[in-house]
Amino acid sequence: LIKILKNVQNEVRDKFTFQYKIVGSYSRNMITYDSKSNIGFDLDVNIYPNDDFNEYSPQEIKTTLIKAFRKYLKKYKYSKIENSTRVITIKVNDTKNARIIHSVDFAIVNDYEDEEGYQCQEYIRFNKKHNSYTWEEQDDGFYMLDEKIEWIKDEDLWPELREMYLKRKNSNNDINKKSRSLFAESVNNICDEYGYFE
């Protein structure tokens, strides 16, 4: 994964640079695997483009990255790339057994501070119906995740969070809902259920 990211960084360097961070369940030691399904594990990565002067539109940024990923897919055994609403997804497929070995979801994000001093994040959203790309603010559920997770750990609720996340992930039938969203929902539900918001 790191090798393909380094190649993509070099490929797009003439236009813009970017940093990346592995986020989601992997970064929190919550990778899951359901042996009964045809879906292997997945990873979530945030890509932070360095476009301080807003030289590139959201469409230019995302399509440039897709083109670069596509160039290196086969070299690293990835067989498919998808341009989803919130992420770019690449997959390693086991065609013989008709299953996904693993997939990686790349969200293109920008962290910033608003006028009131709050840390915020926006992501590039692809509207398939209108074939348009825009920067959109993250949903409220994505904010303060680290603080909520610390509270969950302090309250010894980590097993409850793992159980809820596993249940949500294994029963998820919405192909557009990625594990990072399911994890954030699980964190917020545990916080709501056990009194974080009181």
Predicted regions mapped to residue ranges:
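Right-hand nucleic-acid polymerase module
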Residues: 82-84, 97-198
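Glycine-rich loops and low-complexity Gly/Arg-rich segments
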Residues: 44-48, 70-73, 130-137
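Short glycine-rich, low-complexity/disordered patches
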Residues: 7-23, 74-90, 172-185, 194-198
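Short, extreme N-terminal leader segments that mark the start of a protein/domain
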Residues: 1-7
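Short, conserved charged micro-motifs
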Residues: 53-63
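Active-site nucleotide-donor binding segment shared across nucleotidyl transfer reactions
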Residues: 10-43, 47-55
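Conserved catalytic core of two-metal-ion nucleotidyltransferases
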Residues: 12-16, 62-114
